[in-house]
Amino acid sequence: MSAREERYQRGSKRPAARRENESDNGSWEQADLGNEERKQKFLRLMGAGKKEHTGRLVIGDHKSTSHFRSGVEDKKISDQLEHQYQQSMDSSMSGRNRRHCGLGFSESETTQEKAPPPPPEHPPERESESESSNEVSSEEESESESVSEEETAADKQKPTKPNEKDSFPDSRDGKSNYKMLFVKSTGS
């Protein structure tokens, strides 16, 4: 055996066979795409186009896009940005946006500290309201008070445990209705 055959037997890779037309398969520049413009676009999209360095690119170099700011304008813009930053920091620290509070956050602590005072039971009356509207509102208040007194009296009179006789037939009816529905649905 020759040395070459021994290497193949040991499991080493064979050298790649070169094709004569290999340059044709890998060359994008030789593709026939029509005119030169389409060819350049294709090469640019495929990333195979030749890079042409046109010189140093400076952002804002074009006269139509560049404008010069005065020192006063720069100061004004930086003040506005700083003010916006402070507002966002204050709002995030004050608790207005509590979406991302992290571990250990408890809503109950903050609500006890910053709970707004309860609204007054009777709002102050406006001078522009007529006396008839005041009379109507006072009648509604007295009616609502009497209704709430009747409800509390009715609650006290109701028995705490329902009668077993009343609840038992209802549960049996519910079971029989369920069975009948099941029988009807499977039978048809």
Curated annotation (Swiss-Prot):
What is the protein's given name?
Small acidic protein
Spans of biased composition, class Basic and acidic residues? 49-82, 153-176
Record field: compositional bias (Polar residues)? 83-95
Q: What's the family?
A: Belongs to the SMAP family.
Q: Where is the composition biased (Acidic residues)?
A: 130-152
Taken from the record, one Pfam family name reads SMAP
Question: Which organism does this sequence originate in?
Answer: Xenopus laevis (African clawed frog)
Q: Which domain of life is it from?
A: Eukaryota
Region: Disordered, residue numbers: 1-188
